[in-house]
Structure formats: structure tokens, C-alpha cells
Amino acid sequence: MTDPELDPQRRETIGRFFAAIQGGDYAALQEVLTPDAITRWPQSGERITGAMSCVRVYENYPGGPPSYAVHRISGGGDVWVAELVADYSDGRWYTVSVIEFDGPLIARMTDYFGPSFAAPEWRAAWVERDELTLEPGQSG
């Protein structure tokens, strides 16, 4: 459904998704997903099928669930994008999630993760530093 009246609700649903993971509220996490929701992690070649499998992944995360700082949520209709900083027990990762809805619920997500890295010197003459310094719990 591409009803523009759903856009504010969908933006809120995305926020609730990340807040539920961060807060360990797995009942709330399940509530924002379709029962057959699919999450893809292309960098590791993994696919999570079903809301319950998604819940189980986050329930069993070594070191606990990540903390998120949401930089931006943008989109409209059925397709949205969230840009985040995620702090895991093994470090900070920059994340982009492509989120697809079926009605008011999240039906598909594809998440891309990248660590920070030092900027190469050869580009220094043409670029300026741009630090995304959000802390977990902050949004930009």
C-alpha cells in the first residue's frame, strides 16, 4: 500500500523497531514486523526469515543488543531508508537499512554495515573532515 497518510506512522514504526532492539523489548520488536518479515545482511550472506527468527537473533546477540543513534530516516510510500550509528560489543559500525513495508508493518529490510577507517592522505587536498558524532540514543 502506498497511501501517503501512512508515512508518519511508518517513520514512527522504524523508530520503534530500533528502540525495541536497543531496549531489549522483543515483544515490541515482533509487533512492528510482518510474521513473514525478511531481513538480509548481504555482507555476511545471511537472510533472516520470519519475525520470530529476527527476535531470536537479537535476543541471543553476544554482548547484548546494539545501541543505535539514528542519523536520518527518509522515504515515502513502501520504501524507506534509515542511516544509523550502531555500537556493538565489538565496536562502532555505520549502518544503512533499506526498509520495505506491507501496510503499516515492516516486511523486508536489507542492512549494510561498515566500520570507520582512516581517510587516505592522497585525497586530503580535495576533501574536508565530516564526523558523524552521534552517540547512542541521539538522533540527528
Enumerate the language-model features and the residues they cover.
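C-terminal and inter-domain tail/linker signature
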Residues: 1-140
